[in-house]
Amino acid sequence: MKLLLIRHGDPDYEIDSLTEKGHREAQLLAEKMQHVPVKAFYVSPLGRARATIDYTLKKTGREATILDWMEEFPATLNPQESIGLKNAYGTHKNTVNRVVWDMLPEYWMNHPELCTKDGWRTSEAALMSGMPELYDRVAKGLDELLASHGYCREGKLYHTEKGNEDTIALYCH
């Protein structure tokens, strides 16, 4: 099976849609995607992903399934609530509700637990942002999606009784 992970076009975050450039990118993508034998289309519920896929759906006469777990990963934290996290974002003006992946590289390098398979789950950043629960929600959603196409998780691997050559497209973030 082939998974196509497609990021939305150039975003206009203020209106949760696309810029003029993003609309053009989505149109060009649709020109290519109409020739790809996609078995199923899936899309994030957010406007910029939906605006991106709309061109492909119109071009192909197809529909997409909206999957809530494919929204942009919403883990945020307030670094002001922790002495250890105050310097994670530098001197940026916005000091509350920061997304976890915007931390400075220096912070990541000084906290190697963030880069380990299980260590990140108990890190201060993860616990303050609710990241483990959000991650588990996404992992569960992906497992369910893959199972619906015949691939079931067994530990760290996916197992299938009968493989397939299906292509599925996920329009997300």
Question: What is the predicted function of each stretch?
Answer:
Residues 8-12:
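Short polar catalytic/cofactor-binding loops
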Residues 132, 136, 140-173:
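Active-site-adjacent alpha-helix immediately C-terminal to a catalytic or transition-state-stabilizing loop
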Residues 18-33:
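Short catalytic helix/loop segments, enriched in acidic residues and glycine
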Residues 15, 19, 135:
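Flexible, glycine- and charge-enriched loops at secondary-structure boundaries
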Residues 1-4:
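Extreme N-terminal starter segment of soluble prokaryotic enzymes
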